Structures are given as C-alpha cells and as structure tokens.
Amino acid sequence: EFALNEGKSRLTGEQVALPEKDPKTFTSYEEIEAALFRQFSYMVKHGVISLLTAQKIHKEQAPRPFLSACNEYCVKNGKDLVDGGAKYNIGPVFTGVGLSVTANSLAVIKKLVFEEKSVTLSELIDALNHNWEGYEALRAKAQAVPKYGNDDDYVDSIAKKLADYFYHDVTAYKDIY
C-alpha cells in the first residue's frame, strides 16, 4: 500500500514509510514491484528494531522459569527460554503475514494495468481510494484475476517471489539469541 501511496498512510496522510514517486507515473509492473520491495525492506528493518527491543526486554524483565524448567534444552543448558536456552526461539518473532493478499493485489495490477491494459494505474488507485464504489465493473475484473491458493502459476510465481524476498530480507538480520 505504501508503494501506491508515496509512502504515506491512507488513514492520516502522514509520511510513515519511504517517500515514493507518484504511483500514477509508474510505467511498468517492475517499477511497482521495486517500490514494493523498497517499502518492504524499510518496514522489515524497523520491525526488526522493535523485535530486538522486545526480545531484550523479555530477557531482562520477563523470564519464564516454569516454562524453562519444562524444556529439556533449557534444563540442559541452564538457561531461561528468553535467554536463548531453548533449541528454538519462543520470544517475539518476525512472521510474514499478508502473502496471499499482496500476491493477489500485484496479480491484479500486473494483469489489468500492464498486460491487458484494460485500466490505468490511476483508475485502479482511484477505485481503491473509493473502496470500489462506482467502480463495480472494475472490481469484477479484479476479482476474475487468478488468486493465490488455486494452484495457478500466474499468481503463485508472484507469491514465490514475495516469499523469497521476505526470507532473504528477514534472515539478513539476527535476533539476540
């Protein structure tokens, strides 16, 4: 969403992400994808900062002695769950949500705007800004584009690229454990 709104919140208009150029000037799907990945990396970076802060607070102020006593690795290592005693981290973690929605959204943009050229990006953004009111025919077209989870390579390839990017972006960071 930030890639299509110049890095601004749709609710407040506040600049909350990286500034982007006016999305109506994008001339290719690849430009939109690149903008999305820039925004994504920015959000991951700031999410990781928050996550590391939460992990440190848990370690310092919220030990889990009972749960640690029930975990064979914590007992073996003599360390609390929130101090890296477990085989697998149980503290605040970074999870990827929204893969299907993002893949579906990109599929609509790719198919309708850049392949079929049945709508402009400007028209699509206007439809989204109006929650599809007055754009029912466009909404029907968008709903007809292949959706993730139906074993369709068109959208599955987009989802795979998103998942791969997420994996490589997130695993570039290390947690406190």
Residue ranges and their predicted role:
Residues 1-140:
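Structured mid-domain segments that build the active-site/substrate or prosthetic-cofactor binding neighborhood
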Residues 115-177:
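Acidic, low-complexity N-terminal propeptides/linkers enriched in Ser/Thr/Asp/Gly that mediate export
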